[in-house]
Amino acid sequence: MKYIPPLNFSPVVSTDVSLYRSGYPMPLNYSFIKHQLHLKTIIYIGDKDRPLEEYQSFLESEKIKYYHIFMDSSRDEGIQERMNQVLHLVLDVRNYPILVHSNKGKHRVGVVVGIIRKLLQGWSTAGICQEYGLFSGGMKDGVDLEFITMFETNLKIPRNVIPGFAKHCLYLNELEAAEGSDDESGSESILTAKQPI
């Protein structure tokens, strides 16, 4: 059988977990997703209200969890909170393997991958810009790249669910249990990224 990946498909992480990026999967891609990726979770970053009917049926038949994070552009009101929602999903090993897709697999998913590269993998701004340009056909959206560069967050993540690839990132700090507290109170890490003043 011939397997056809979705538009602009590529691995983002393939270490202890598998994280992929792509454009919107079409019916001709479903066999590839089913037999090659074995997904638990799909995160759609885009402006479509609901999955196409065939896509919805495929997700249900494969028991794939589907999350829609609305995004028209990186200028959207509330975009910070939406990117934090994506990070919460990506920082939970129970959601893997994960596919993050937008409509074409270019700009919107490029923003998400850029933030992951910056915060969780320690990529340089130059490397992030180069990858963004590769998937967008050389079109580098200055607003998107500025958003990635200036992105700030402050998330609490349970330690025991953080995937191995992210455990040693520069922005992830262990929260210490307060003296005299029970064992559960120190069971989180905090992902903090602030711009220097």
UniProtKB/Swiss-Prot annotation:
Assigned GO CC terms: cytoplasm
Residue numbers of Phosphoserine PTMs: 181
Subcellular localization(s) per the UniProt record: Cytoplasm
The entry's keywords: Cytoplasm, Hydrolase, Phosphoprotein
PROSITE patterns assigned: TYR_PHOSPHATASE_DUAL
Classification via Pfam families: Y_phosphatase2
Ranges for domain Tyrosine-protein phosphatase: 10-160
Record Gene3D superfamilies: Protein tyrosine phosphatase superfamily (3.90.190.10)
GO molecular function: inositol diphosphate tetrakisphosphate diphosphatase activity; phosphatase activity
Additional information: Present with 4530 molecules/cell in log phase SD medium.
UniProt family annotation: Belongs to the protein-tyrosine phosphatase family.
Role of this protein: Required for normal growth in the presence of linoleic acid hydroperoxide (LoaOOH).
Name this protein carries in UniProt: Tyrosine-protein phosphatase-like protein OCA2
Species whose genome carries this gene: Saccharomyces cerevisiae (strain ATCC 204508 / S288c)
